[in-house]
Structures are given as C-alpha cells and as structure tokens.
Amino acid sequence: MRVAIYPGSFDPVTYGHIDIIKRGANLFDKLIVAVLLNPAKRPLFSIQERIELLKEVTKDIPNVEVDYFDGLLVEYAKKVNASAIIKGLRMVSDFEYEFQMALVNKKLNPSVETIFLMTSPKYGYLSSSLVKEIAQFGGCLSEFVPDIVAERLMEKFKKS
C-alpha cells in the first residue's frame, strides 16, 4: 500500500489545503493528513478542533485519514509506513523553505520522498493567516473556507 503524509498546522483548514488533500489522495492508496503539534506556536484552534474540522471536510474522501504528530516528521513517516510527504507550494517563496526541509528529511530518512504539488491558481494567494485576519474583522469567508470552518472562526472571534 502506498501511503503519503500531508503535514501542516491547518489553523484553520482552507480550500487551498482541501485542494492539495484531494489531489494527493488521487496519487496514493492512503493519505494521512497530519496536524503538527507544535508547543512553540499558539494556534487559534486546539489540536482536537483542527482534527475535528479536518475529519469533517475530508469525510467524503475515502482514502484520507486525519492524525496528529509531534517531533520529527520523518520519524512519524516511519511509524505510519509512509513513503512520501506531500507539500503544497503557493509561490516561489514557499519553495526555498520547503526544498530545504525536503533535503533535511531525505538526509534523516532516505526512504521517504517529498512530493511538491503546486497550488491551483485560484488558491495561490490563500493562507490560514489571511483567513484568520479576515475573520477577525468580520469579513466574508465563503471563498476561502468551508461553512463549518467559517462558523467556528466566527465563534472564536466573537469570544475574544
């Protein structure tokens, strides 16, 4: 079975992420969407909330699983028997960092390949940070995230 990991913070998941998830799922028997648990960051959504939202928005993609990890991605790849890491690239500026990470991951675990998928042009500008900023000021989110994500974002910003 060909298994790949699509890692990220997904805080929150956007249509850009979902685009990469669907395309990655078409390339592998199983795609694990893996939420990074990074204690150095202060995410808007808890790890449980991000997992729940990802499960909801991927429920119609049968070969997608949602999980979380901390530590080294290549160690997680070993644990789940993944042979590939999928990374979405929005623009050239993403490539420099992601290429460096791919080389480090290859050095740490030569059996894991990194596959870069270019973001669909209609999502090239989209980021979770941008979505949070729009939500914070009460802007319309329908072009950026599924309804369930927009609802949760608005709830978060009403509380603050």
Swiss-Prot record:
Keyword terms of this UniProt record: ATP-binding, Coenzyme A biosynthesis, Cytoplasm, Magnesium, Nucleotide-binding, Nucleotidyltransferase, Transferase
The keyword Ribonucleoprotein is assigned to this record: no
Cystine connections: none
Gene Ontology cellular-component terms listed: cytoplasm
Pfam hit, one: CTP_transf_like
Swiss-Prot/TrEMBL site (Transition state stabilizer) positions: 17
SUPFAM superfamilies (alphabetical): Nucleotidylyl transferase
Pathway(s) of this molecule: Cofactor biosynthesis; coenzyme A biosynthesis; CoA from (R)-pantothenate: step 4/5
CDD domains noted in UniProt: PPAT
Entry cofactors: Mg(2+)
An individual GO BP term: coenzyme A biosynthetic process
Catalytic activity: (R)-4'-phosphopantetheine + ATP + H(+) = 3'-dephospho-CoA + diphosphate
EC number: 2.7.7.3
Positions contributing to ATP binding: 9-10, 17, 88-90, 98, 123-129
Signal peptide (UniProt feature, chain positions): none
GO molecular function: ATP binding; pantetheine-phosphate adenylyltransferase activity
Record-linked Gene3D superfamilies: HUPs
Positions of transmembrane segments: none
UniProt subcellular location: Cytoplasm
Residues binding substrate, per UniProt: 9, 41, 73, 87
HAMAP family cross-referenced by the UniProt entry: PPAT_bact (MF_00151)
Function comment: Reversibly transfers an adenylyl group from ATP to 4'-phosphopantetheine, yielding dephospho-CoA (dPCoA) and pyrophosphate.
Family to which this protein belongs: Belongs to the bacterial CoaD family.
Subunit structure: Homohexamer.
Protein's recorded name: Phosphopantetheine adenylyltransferase
